[in-house]
Swiss-Prot record:
Phenotype of null mutants: Abolishes completely the production of KK-1.
Compositional bias per record (Basic and acidic residues), positions renumbered to this chain: 440-449, 500-527
Protein name per the record: KK-1 biosynthesis cluster protein D
Entry's induction text: Expression is positively regulated by the KK-1 cluster-specific transcription factor kk1F.
Pathway annotation from the record: Secondary metabolite biosynthesis
Keyword Iron-sulfur tagged: no
Amino acid sequence: MALQERRAAVTSSDILSAHAISSPALAAAAINFAASFHRDARTCCSAHERSQLQKVYRDKILANDKFTANIAAAFLSVLGPNAGRNDAGAERERWGDFDRLAQRGKNMRDRESQHLQHQSGIIAAWGPRCFEYYGWHVLPLPLLRQVHDLAVLIPSWDDAVELLNSRMLLRHELRVLHGNNKALRIGEHSAASKVQDSRSPVERTDIVAALDWARANATSAAARQAVKEAAQGMNGTPINTFGLKRDCYGMVVPSVGPYDPDGDDDNDEDVVDVSPRPAKHIKLSAAEPLRLMFPGSLSHVQACQRHDTDGEKASTAPIRSNKLSQSKQPELDTAAESLRTRHIHNERINEPLDEVSDCSLSLQTIAVGGGSAQEETPDQDVEHAHPEVEITSAISSELRKVDERTDGIRIGRVIMRRSHCMVREQDNQTNEEGTGEVQSQRDRRARDLGKDMETDMDIDSQLEEMLDIHALEAQRNHEEMSDGEDVVAGVAGPGTPTHRAAEEGGCREKEAENAKTDEEQVQDKAALDQAGNTNTNREVENAAPKAHSQEGALRASRTGTIVERTVELHSTHSIHQRASVNTTAPTVARSSDSDDSDSLHSPTALQNLQAYIDTRTHQLTQVLSQLNSTPDVRHHAQLQLDWLSPQRWASVYVEPEHHMGATSSASSDSADIWCLDWDTFHQYADSNHVFRRPVVIKQKFQDSGMYEVDRYVDMLWQRFPEQHIEVQNSITGTSRLMSMAEYCSTALTVTEAGTSLSDNTTSVSNAVNLRCLARADEPLLTRLERFQLLSTLASRVAGTIGRTEHSPPSNLESLLGFDALSFADAFSSSHANLFGGSWVRCLDGLKIYAIAADLDAEDWRRFADEGYKWSPRGKGRLIALEEDDVLFIPPGLRAIHASFTPEPCLMEGGMLWDECAIPEILDELLWIARHQAGTVQPLEFQLSSLIDALEQWLNENNHINQSSPSHTAAEERQTLKASIQSLRDCLSGRSAAFPS
């Protein structure tokens, strides 16, 4: 009887009326239809009732086939792929009609149809409430498809949520218990994640891992039971021990945060320690160094706190506001004024480097806690600092939030060590230089650097001390706050226990907090009293070692994460500040020794980027040295080691130095790489300068930051769902064809997980033969007339080639623009540009180019014999590219190069010729035609028409050097014609050996 009522209700409803309805109305109707099925399916008590319910909904879908092909596709798995297929007669025909309708819906490739299919399928299985609660309706299509596949395999929400919980707890355990910094805690989202809803703790990796498990174990009762047990805790410990709980739909979430409406928890032991989420990648653009280096500094946090408190003061009452008396209001006003002053100071920090190079950015003038004990008179008792403690507590909370948002800090420790070494080396060289002014400048820089770092550490140490005093709830009378200069209550130099503990980081933070006793808190208070009653900076310096000797190490380990980050940030800034000072200092004679040159100059932006990559490449070389499963794998791994180990970073000539750092080469001629901004490159190009070295161009793009690897992979699937893609394996060096569906699924998993040298990563290491699909803005150098020669000739011969069946690398027009998509630890093998010069722009991620340019005849003979297996034998030089960097390999520069990928990277580039280097281009093409047998037939096929067009172009007096004297121009023209004829003869002879 109940089933008949449901049948009548569904039949009489107008959810999917056959009348014309708009697309949004159709989507809403489809969602309601799926929700209705979920509700009715839950009331079925037997298989027979469910079978009858399936027929009811099948008939309803068939009655509105004009509008419901998408719904049929979504319900194909929900109603069961084999449901009723064994029936005879009319029922069998009805199921056949339903299958055909569903297939028609599956063939719809537009985004709207596919979103509708997957959303309806998920809601029909799990219901609409959890789907809307977690905001899954805004998931990108590839991830939504994977959630739908999971719902098909695990149709019960109770089972599905346990499976997702078990996957989330695995990564949470890796981070909290095993210290894996790449793993995300539950509730954290990576920068590249598309699951950003505040109530959804799942990441793409959780969904993919759950889907992989379901495909293998969905029918195993024992496996499901094991999953339920794993979802109850970590290593047998309940989840609430780690600051986790279950939300209203059974999902494991943090017990405090956006998942808790109250947002308040006084039990600090239940909350896991907070540290920065894993960064997608580091951006060290030289255009805005200070804005990058200071986002987590204390002044920035206080400025943020200023903005936050202004907006919330009227609506949110402080938790302990009843403890504040009216007499403390002046102190709060003073604290607010101090925060406002530091907000202005922070805005100056965010100015361009050249505008603030002469400004003092020392953090010694920052008042801790909005003007608390640091601004009191010597006779004032610090235990009455309640209002300021309230502010410092908020600042401490804000520090943790900013730590989670700040991603570009991983290289600070390396740069800090380099900066100390540079200062010491500079001091040791002062006697040889004999310049008093240089000596005084270096002394000031060293003194400022030490004070700034020491001040930063003491500021954070005092924050913790004041919080401890607040815990003691001390009550004493206040005196008027001093209007004098801020005093910092301790200096912890590089040799003190505080600094050594800060170097070790925050790994002992939890243990130190548990070990903190009331007696130690009293000692902290005494140390702060001693520092707070100090009148002069000299007394501060004398008191600091004594105050910090007993408690410094413990305090620094407790606040290690905050102190280390602040020191790293300010140390990095100090390096940039010294680079600015060097531009006005007297010129120092450069030594021919590269090591001495490095000690005399501040690191360039490229060298800072290289410092970050050093650790990554070292780890890669260690892994490669252990790969010896087969001879091919061992040989290919050795080839990568020949390029990477030992690391030989290119010497860089930088111009202009004041903008991008300092040159690391003795001269422009001896440099391996040039690094220029666009204006400087443009000046060289306008003067018809022939570039003899690769050039890294720093240029600003309007579309900067608009390209991401995962979005590009999604675009590939949308455009070419039924095609195959050629990919190269970085372990074996071999290439194979993969279906686009398999490639995109694996690539998205790799992008989210951040894995390297795993089976998944190596299988999709390099996507080759990609034409220009990103359509990013090209660098401005391609707009210069002298670099448009190849595109001009290609346009002249367009339509005369007569073939289209070539692979993309052999297609002339495809060489004018191409994309390169690589994943972690991808290696491209050794190769030379087929058509001369090239440019590549890094759209997303990081890339290392290894270039061997200064080669002799023996090296080129080996390359002709070995091809992509050629080893540089120590002649390769490395250069790192970050987002928006452009690498220009000049036409006519004969060089062999390979590329490595530290993290997923998307690049776009193209080939070009230079009108100022036509003789060199012809020589390069002649060498390739003689030695590259694998490209002879397609090379001859394309160059035969291209050379004719070039000769005609030269006869029209289009050569850029036509202003030369007549006799010189005639000689150049005859030389070019002779080279063209030699190339034509070579191609004709080899074409006879390789007939079509």
